[in-house]
């Protein structure tokens, strides 16, 4: 979760360590007359994908990873009540006009690249923005990490025994033959040195626990690395693992429909129907 340390300090807010604290902070911000969240789903032909990430994060924080796996594989139907509840949990943030910049009607039409800029306006349009490690590339020119912005782990519930789940995507390197050069390269890629060569170039985050963190190009990536290697559960982006017609189709559009007023149950039913149609 990205935020402005100055905005937090000016308002006496502390970084939440649990989901309970995050929910309480969200309400407190709104009560103080501040808007807690910037959320934007617009992404051209991929509009809706940021909301699928919210859903995946919530599923990992409300149910064991086995339930997440069942959902992603459709062993558990998309319209199971657990999934509907997760969608409505997202709605707690996105559908409350007091909680989101521009009101709930702006969520679907606000560009995902533009939505975090509300952190940096004067006065700020929002206090927090949930997005992956790449998003600083779209922050306004001249803002400085650790000064103008920082981040904290999107927290888990203290009341649920689910550890510290982390959601992510990534690059997989696969050997297509076993000739000596390929074998040696694959062996090299297992060593910290291989990762450290990329770490210093920026834009690269590794789950390798044996690397020297000082090799990262910034404190931001050192902090993100700590979140990644500190995960008790890691799961790959669910929509990326689903069939394309769902994960890059009905799931995207369904989340837009939800933010535009369609019920979570109707959205979940429609997504499940689209999945049934390709089986």
For each predicted feature, which ranges?
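Short, solvent-exposed loop/beta-turn-alpha elements that line the ligand-binding surface or hinge
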Residues: 41, 45, 60-85, 141-144, ...
């Amino acid at each position: 979760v990205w935020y402005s340390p100055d905005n937090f300090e000016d308002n006496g807010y502390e970084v939440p360590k649990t989901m309970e604290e995050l929910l309480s902070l969200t309400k407190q911000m709104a009560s103080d007359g501040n808007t807690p969240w910037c959320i934007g789903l617009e992404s051209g032909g991929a509009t809706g994908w940021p909301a699928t990430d919210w859903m995946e994060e919530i599923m990992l924080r409300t149910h064991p990873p086995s339930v997440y796996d069942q959902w992603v594989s459709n062993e558990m139907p998309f319209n199971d009540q657990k999934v509907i509840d997760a969608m409505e949990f997202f709605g707690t943030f996105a559908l409350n006009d007091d909680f989101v910049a521009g009101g709930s009607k702006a969520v679907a039409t606000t560009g995902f690249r533009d939505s975090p800029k509300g952190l940096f306006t004067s006065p700020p349009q929002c206090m927090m923005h949930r997005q992956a490690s790449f998003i600083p590339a779209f922050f306004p020119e001249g803002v400085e990490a650790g000064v103008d912005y920082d981040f904290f782990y999107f927290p888990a519930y203290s009341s649920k025994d689910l550890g510290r789940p982390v959601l992510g995507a990534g690059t997989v390197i696969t050997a297509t033959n076993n000739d000596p050069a390929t074998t040696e390269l694959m062996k090299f890629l297992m060593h910290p040195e291989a990762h450290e060569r990329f770490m210093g170039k920026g834009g690269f985050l590794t789950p390798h626990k044996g690397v020297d963190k000082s090799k990262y190009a910034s404190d931001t990536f050192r902090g993100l690395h700590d979140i990644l290697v500190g995960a008790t559960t890691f799961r790959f982006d669910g929509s990326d693992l689903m069939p394309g017609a769902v994960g890059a189709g009905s799931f995207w559009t369904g989340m837009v429909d939800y933010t535009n007023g369609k019920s979570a149950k109707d959205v979940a039913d429609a997504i499940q129907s689209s999945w049934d149609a390709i089986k």
